[in-house]
From Swiss-Prot:
Pfam short name (any one): Ribosomal_L21p
SUPFAM superfamilies hit by this protein: L21p-like
GO cellular component: cytoplasm; ribonucleoprotein complex; ribosome
Keyword RNA-binding annotated: yes
UniProt cross-references to NCBIfam families, sorted A to Z: L21
Annotated family: Belongs to the bacterial ribosomal protein bL21 family.
Role: This protein binds to 23S rRNA in the presence of protein L20.
InterPro entries, per the entry: bL21-like (IPR028909), bL21-like_sf (IPR036164), Ribosomal_bL21 (IPR001787), Ribosomal_bL21_CS (IPR018258)
One of the GO BP terms on file: translation
Species of the source: Thiobacillus denitrificans (strain ATCC 25259 / T1)
Protein name per Swiss-Prot or TrEMBL: Large ribosomal subunit protein bL21
Any one GO molecular function term: rRNA binding
Amino acid sequence: MYAVIKTGGKQYRVSAGDKLKIEKLEAEVGSEITFDQVLMVGDGADIKMGAPLLRGATVSATVLNQARGDKIKIFKMRRRKHYRKSQGHRQYFTEVQIGGITA
């Protein structure tokens, strides 16, 4: 069984037991969270689709970790003008493990 959930402005296809890195959520490590924005649930040939969301469908998950991603470097430059600007960014994320899907 799998589901398509929406969180942090992105959509993820998840199954029970999957580990997932999503945009940062305000939750303690080890706590149980519930995703109620479920777009689709599938089990073999039986597929339920929402318009846009499925009513009563939820996906439960456990928070494994709160961390920051790898550093990306932003570098702007104008040729021949001696203009250089460098900046770095590390995005916060939450790592979760999908527990169960109810439809």
